[in-house]
Regions:
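Short, basic, low-complexity termini and linkers enriched in Ser/Thr/Gly/Pro
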Residues: 1-31
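Core dinuclear metal-dependent hydrolase active-site scaffold
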Residues: 34-92, 120-191, 251-277
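P-loop/Walker A phosphate-binding loop and immediately adjacent motor/lid segment at beta-alpha junctions
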Residues: 51, 108-144, 212-228, 244-248
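Cap/insert and terminal regions of metallo-dependent hydrolase folds
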Residues: 180-273
Length: 277
């Protein structure tokens, strides 16, 4: 089931136009607001914040930008499912699939079983952003426009979306293929972040240093790096710094609001290889 959110077209992060299209709608007169979103930005439309919960969630990583987030009530959110790109292909089920970028490494929605709702960060044609802002069962989902760095002589900058998921009282931000630290407009739209799923691969996206700058901006308690293939050199550069790092021998973890670290810590999930599934 494909759910198309309202679309918005604007020039690359011109502040007045960005606020007009993405922020002003949130300032309308609905009184319920997300715990994640900036308190000055109120969501519009009939979308309500899910009831507060404090259960444990599961985060499972399949490689690249492909995650499965499972709430304590069993709602499964799939992010950026990949096609054939060298990682093992999982058998995965989901209620909702988010697509941050229209590329075969991010939009293989047919892989996901269960007739999920599909939320695309870009309108058909790939050159306009969609504004996503809804509650599905116990999970609030909204997006933030980002740019990936393209090849200037051919593509220039490529549009995409990051997504925020509020579940079980936690604010989880999937940064998408972001190519530089966030500007003030984007930071306001992102809001509070507890868990950051952060791109670090470089070339077309931020690299290790850019990823660390985004940690400084968002101040999450838990950071899970992504989008670095099997490049351990990139990972070593990302973990070389002030943040405590944990290397897990599994591709999943469970956590809750009450068990988050007090200061930012990096959790490195296992990169799956053939034979691991």
């Amino acid at each position: 089931m494909e759910l198309k959110a309202q679309s918005s077209k604007f020039k690359p992060f011109g502040r007045p136009l960005l606020f007009l299209i993405f922020v002003i709608p949130y300032l309308l007169v609905l009184q319920v607001q997300a715990a994640c979103r900036n308190p000055n930005i109120v969501q519009s439309g009939p979308f309500l914040r899910p009831a507060a919960a404090s259960g444990r969630i599961e985060i499972k990583w399949f490689g690249h930008s492909f995650f499965q987030l499972t709430s304590s009530e069993g709602t499964k959110i799939i992010t950026d499912p990949f096609g054939a790109m060298g990682f093992p292909m999982p058998e995965v089920w989901g209620n909702v699939v988010t697509v941050g970028r229209e590329h075969g490494n991010h939009n293989n929605v047919g892989l996901v079983k269960g007739n999920p709702v599909v939320l695309r960060g870009l309108k058909e044609g790939k050159d306009e952003w969609n504004q996503v802002n809804l509650t599905f069962r116990d999970v609030l989902i909204y997006n933030v426009p980002v740019y990936q760095r393209g090849l200037p002589e051919y593509y220039g900058s490529l549009k995409g979306s990051g997504f925020v998921f509020e579940m079980d009282g936690l604010c989880i931000f999937h940064s998408g293929d972001v190519s530089e630290p966030f500007n003030e407009d984007q930071l306001q739209m992102i809001g509070h972040v507890d868990i950051l799923l952060q791109t670090i691969g470089g070339v077309y996206t931020v690299g290790p240093e850019g990823g660390k700058k985004i940690i400084e901006q968002l101040k999450p308690k838990m950071v899970i790096p992504m989008h670095y293939w099997y490049n351990m050199n990139v990972l070593d550069r990302f973990t070389d710094g002030p943040y405590r790092s944990w290397f897990l021998n599994t591709n999943s973890l469970t956590t809750s609001k009450d068990t988050l670290p007090l200061t930012p810590e990096i959790f490195i999930l296992k990169v799956l290889r053939e034979g691991d599934l």
